[in-house]
Amino acid sequence: MIKVLVVDDHDLVRTGITRMLADIDGLQVVGQADSGEESLKKARELKPDVVLMDVKMPGIGGLEATRKMLRSHPDIKVVAVTVCEEDPFPTRLLQAGAAGYMTKGAGLAEMVQAIRLVFAGQRYISPQIAQQLALKSFQPQVNNSPFDLLSEREIQIALMIVGCQKVQTISDKLCLSPKTVNTYRYRIFEKLSISSDVELALLAVRHGMVDASA
């Protein structure tokens, strides 16, 4: 039996995935989590084989949660399930150790296939994402997105700033001092050649880092 943990900040998505997988032989959804922080707690408690991880969530987000989870539980297989099809997200998640990357537009059959493949030690990447990554490997090495210049931590903090989270809130969630958060903030501004949170938000929307309709 493959034990699955479903991580998404939207209750309808978590419930929908759980119900879809309930009737699949050989799979058991052992729990749900609505944030990156909770996913780490549930991973310790429930010891899932496979984690279906959303990327954009409040708090530390799917990227940082994946990195921390695999550091503590290297045997867990993480599959990103997200609307984020454009780089840098696929590349960043796979570099962080995710075993799979698929879009929320995938059907039940594809999701089950992904779970079984990664459990067996293979990787699964949705065809459209795989094609995009393959084409990118043949392109000249240029920074298509200014966010490619940022480290994982800088992207994490940038997205939290765009999400209107205050410095103290970011500090508390990431266990960093407010001074350190501000240092990251100014470094992000410098790398992106911007000077305000508003410019950061506009740049994030323009390059697909956030959903403009959200």
UniProtKB/Swiss-Prot annotation:
Residues 3-119 form the Response regulatory domain. It holds the Pfam family GerE. Phosphorylated by LemA. It comes from the Bacteria. Keywords: Activator, DNA-binding, Phosphoprotein, Transcription, Transcription regulation, Two-component regulatory system. GO terms for molecular function: DNA binding. Residues 143-208 form the HTH luxR-type domain. The gene is gacA. GO terms for biological process: phosphorelay signal transduction system; regulation of DNA-templated transcription. PANTHER family: RESPONSE REGULATOR UVRY, TWO-COMPONENT RESPONSE REGULATOR. The modification 4-aspartylphosphate is found at D54. Forms part of a two-component regulatory system GacA/GacA(LemA). May be involved in lesion formation, swarming and in the production of extracellular protease, syringomycin and N-acyl-L-homoserine lactone (acyl-HSL). This is Response regulator GacA. Residues 167-186 bind DNA. InterPro entries: CheY-like_superfamily, Sig_transdc_resp-reg_C-effctor, Sig_transdc_resp-reg_receiver, Tscrpt_reg_LuxR_C, WalR-like.
